[in-house]
């Protein structure tokens, strides 16, 4: 599927590495009012055998991929039994609106499918209309509300599901 992102730059999606954490933490701080800590990511990458994290690296169209292209976005998922639970998705503000979030979500869904997953679930802030629109365009449906889910402001989260 072609996206605007691929018209301006190419995107490679691959597993997150420990050396990506500095860039990931910057994206995290720019994206969320209560960002995850370095320790939280280290715990996910090193200790959680159900966790999978992907990064998107962008580079100019038609150019060979640089050896050290920096991450411009990332997504995480837990695979529990046959269900993928999206833990987080974020794209650097300079790269938003180019389809990178969609590319990451599609890659996460592919990963879950390859590992035998049958469905996906996630929570999204009630006020995050951009993310809700993306998830609906990917086939996610609202399945309920988690009241006061987000600790920073007690905001509700919509629960969304999708069969793969």
Where are these regions (language model features)?
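C-terminal "cap" of GNAT-fold acetyltransferases
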Residues: 2, 6, 17, 53, ...
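Acetyl-CoA-dependent GNAT
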Residues: 2-7, 15-98, 105-115, 163-164
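Short beta-alpha junctions and helix-cap segments that line functional grooves
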Residues: 41-42, 145-147
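Well-formed, non-transmembrane alpha-helical positions, independent of function
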Residues: 23, 133-134
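Conserved SAM-binding loop
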Residues: 13, 97, 123-124, 142
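ABC family nucleotide-binding domain
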Residues: 95-96, 100, 107, 136-138, ...
